[in-house]
Amino acid sequence: NDGVYIGVTATPARLDLNNTFQNENHKWVFFQPHSEYKGQDFFFPIESQGNVFAVDYNLYFLKDESHNPSKELRDSIYRYLVNSTNLNLFVNQKIKNYVMLIHTSVKMENHTGDKKVTNDLFSELAQKKGPKFLRHMEQIYNFALKKTEDEEKAKKICKFIATNADKHQIGVLNSDRNNKLGFDLKKFSEEPSSLFTISIGGNIISRGITFNNLISMFFTRGVKGLMQQDTYIQRARMFGNRGKDANHFELTITESIYKQWFSCFLLHRLSYLSAKNNLHQVWLEGSRTRAVAPSSIDKSYVRVDKGEISFSKI
């Protein structure tokens, strides 16, 4: 009864609104992130250039309604191959094994479909001949030329990929028992063991797993209703420490999901400021986002107000 509980959280809203362990928010201590950590200010910056988000990495928007999701995934894999190869040939002092993360759905049957698209592509590349191989190489050359604007570099990138395409591994990270048999998670996350490493998954990958050398992310997992800030703030931890590769990172995502995710962090910033400046914590929600799940709120402890807020020019 005389003990003191000290907790650490990345999602203070849920802790506070849930009244977890009779939380005393006036005693909170706020820690600064590590200097190498790339967080909300890097991936979801407030700054814009006209109507475009002013990001310092490669942000590739998809249409909300896809008529050919398999092609979108293949194109993203092509760009990943080109991007990682470009770094290994023309930037890095030594070869690095880069990871691409594919997160399209929480449903495990969809992970099987994503794996088939990925398997087929790499299997056809590994054959090093035939019409399918040539079609892949043509697409890869086009992406390489667009990226480098240099025909010789584009040809070298294609040659490297054609030679090394068999140095790949594809893993599905979910709760399916068959996928866990003999599966070494570190090889697909913290310590990628193959030149081209593809990690596919659902909830498991967004629960605090660290992905080192993550250079590409294909994210199309939307939400049916409102996006929960606590869930998507936690999910963003997979971005993590990008180091010197940060500006070469590519996020492929639908524009609507990105904007919802951006709104989560924008409202979180405002709420965080109220807490950090010794004001009574106010956890803000938007028209398409909510702070936490309604079931997580201790209604005897929390007052909910609804209305509109206006601001003068800042």
Give the location of each predicted region.
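Conserved P-loop NTPase catalytic core
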Residues: 1-90, 99
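Short glycine-/polar-rich loops that comprise or flank the Walker A/P-loop
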Residues: 2-3, 24-28, 97, 212-215, ...
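A short beta-strand-to-loop transition that corresponds to the Sensor-1 phosphate-sensing loop
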Residues: 8-12, 34, 104-106, 200-204, ...
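Short helix/loop capping segments that flank catalytic or ligand/cofactor-binding pockets
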Residues: 15-17, 39-42, 110-112, 181, ...
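Short secondary-structure boundary/capping segments
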Residues: 18-31, 44-50, 114-122, 215-218, ...
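C-terminal helicase lobe and adjacent C-terminal extensions/tails of nucleic-acid helicase motors
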Residues: 53-138, 142, 239-249, 253-314
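Conserved C-terminal RecA-like helicase domain
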Residues: 93-197
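Conserved RecA-like P-loop NTPase helicase motor core
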Residues: 178-259
